[in-house]
Every structure is written in structure tokens, then in C-alpha cells.
């Protein structure tokens, strides 16, 4: 089951966000949170907040276990 979270109107360029997003694609949630917490890029806190939102959606709306979740697909668009 796919769980979705969307962030819009973020004050960082898509190119900079893409560098951070590429680090966590395919990772388990705990590993992705650790990577984002230790990352010094300006987009890391924004992506971490979005990741936590997606996890909260999965746990609260679909009763999924946080330990079983991973980042299957994450992407950045210019808009």
C-alpha cells in the first residue's frame, strides 16, 4: 500500500531538494530519518518534516507498523 504526503511552496530550489531526496530513496524509515537528521543541507529539515507526515498518515489512517515502512518513491517537481 502506498501512502502519500505532498509539500508545496517550499523556499528551496528543486535542484537542492533533489540532492537530499536522492539520499533517502529506497531506505527504511528509521535509516532515512537518521540520514536527514545528520544532513547539513538546507532542504533536509523540510524533507524530514514531509517524511514524518507520510509516516503519520500511514500509522493513523491505515494502521501500518512504522518499522515495516520504507521510502519506495520520492520525487521533486518544479511548480
From Swiss-Prot:
Signal peptide: none annotated. It comes from the Bacteria. Part of the 50S ribosomal subunit. One of its GO terms (biological process) is translation. Keywords: Ribonucleoprotein, Ribosomal protein, RNA-binding, rRNA-binding. GO terms for molecular function: rRNA binding; structural constituent of ribosome. This protein binds specifically to 23S rRNA; its binding is stimulated by other ribosomal proteins, e.g. L4, L17, and L20. It is important during the early stages of 50S assembly. It makes multiple contacts with different domains of the 23S rRNA in the assembled 50S subunit and ribosome. CDD domains: Ribosomal_L22 (cd00336). The lineage of its organism: Bacteria, Bacillati, Mycoplasmatota, Mollicutes, Acholeplasmatales. GO terms for cellular component: cytosolic large ribosomal subunit. Belongs to the universal ribosomal protein uL22 family. This is Large ribosomal subunit protein uL22.
Amino acid at each position: 500500500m502506498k501512502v502519500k504526503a505532498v509539500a508545496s511552496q517550499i523556499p528551496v530550489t528543486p535542484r537542492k531538494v533533489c540532492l537530499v531526496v536522492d539520499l533517502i530513496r529506497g531506505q527504511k524509515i528509521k535509516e532515512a530519518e537518521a540520514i536527514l537528521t545528520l544532513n547539513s543541507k538546507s532542504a533536509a529539515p523540510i524533507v524530514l518534516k514531509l517524511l514524518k507526515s507520510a509516516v503519520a498518515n500511514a500509522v493513523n489512517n491505515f494502521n501500518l507498523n512504522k518499522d515495516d515502512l520504507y521510502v519506495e518513491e520520492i520525487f521533486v517537481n518544479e511548480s
